[in-house]
Amino acid sequence: MTNLEKAARTYCLPETTTPENLACRWTCNVNFGKRFLAAGYYYTYKEPCYYGAVYEHTDDDLSCEGEIRLIAVSEERFEDNGHALAWAMQQ
């Protein structure tokens, strides 16, 4: 199992989905060109709890119904969702 697969399981991230489905499950998400970025919260006692995730459109359908595929999840956890999204934008 790859690190990406482990992170997807830990944070319950679907490996493929649509922006619409992901937006219904995560409150902090952004269309960013051909990528779709999400920040999520994973409780860890007295430690930073936010992570970033990057999805990529699998075809030219950039609408909310186009398929996206998980390509990166932060190994680091951040103090807030803004820092998690900033990480995702740099990927």
PLM regions: where:
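Terminal low-complexity, poorly structured segments
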Residues: 9, 18, 33, 58, ...
